[in-house]
């Protein structure tokens, strides 16, 4: 078979994900065109804030409590 149907959650949304070539599992082609949704500036700002706080708040906590993690 030159194209194998990849069973995943996209089938529930009536999309089929197909391998483009045998032996190239990283390259997939979708059966529908890509969506053209443009993010608003507010959505972009919220996404950036969430992204950076997800990584910087735990790092700041660890760095501020470093003497306790070392074992004094």
Curated annotation (Swiss-Prot):
It comes from the Eukaryota. The keyword Glycoprotein does not apply. Residues 1-29 form a transit peptide. Coiled coil: none annotated. Disulfide bonds: none annotated. The keyword Chaperone does not apply. Residues 65-72 are mitochondrial intermembrane. The chain crosses the membrane at residues 41-64. Pathway: Energy metabolism; oxidative phosphorylation. GO terms for biological process: mitochondrial electron transport, cytochrome c to oxygen. It is found in: Mitochondrion inner membrane. It is a single-pass membrane protein. InterPro entries: Cyt_c_oxidase_su8, Cyt_c_oxidase_su8_sf. Keywords: Membrane, Mitochondrion, Mitochondrion inner membrane, Transit peptide, Transmembrane, Transmembrane helix. Residues 30-40 are mitochondrial matrix. One of its GO terms (cellular component) is mitochondrial inner membrane. Belongs to the cytochrome c oxidase VIII family. Component of the cytochrome c oxidase, the last enzyme in the mitochondrial electron transport chain which drives oxidative phosphorylation. The respiratory chain contains 3 multisubunit complexes succinate dehydrogenase (complex II, CII), ubiquinol-cytochrome c oxidoreductase (cytochrome b-c1 complex, complex III, CIII) and cytochrome c oxidase (complex IV, CIV), that cooperate to transfer electrons derived from NADH and succinate to molecular oxygen, creating an electrochemical gradient over the inner membrane that drives transmembrane transport and the ATP synthase. Component of the cytochrome c oxidase (complex IV, CIV), a multisubunit enzyme composed of 14 subunits. The complex is composed of a catalytic core of 3 subunits MT-CO1, MT-CO2 and MT-CO3, encoded in the mitochondrial DNA, and 11 supernumerary subunits COX4I, COX5A, COX5B, COX6A, COX6B, COX6C, COX7A, COX7B, COX7C, COX8 and NDUFA4, which are encoded in the nuclear genome. This is Cytochrome c oxidase subunit 8C, mitochondrial. It comes from Mus musculus. The lineage of its organism: Eukaryota, Metazoa, Chordata, Craniata, Vertebrata.
């Amino acid at each position: 078979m030159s194209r194998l149907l990849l069973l995943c959650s996209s089938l529930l949304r009536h999309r089929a994900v197909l391998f483009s070539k045998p032996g190239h599992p990283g390259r997939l082609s979708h059966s529908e065109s890509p969506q053209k949704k443009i993010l608003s500036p507010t959505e972009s700002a919220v996404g950036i804030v969430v992204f950076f706080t997800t990584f910087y708040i735990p790092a700041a906590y660890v760095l501020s409590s470093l003497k306790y993690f070392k074992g004094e």
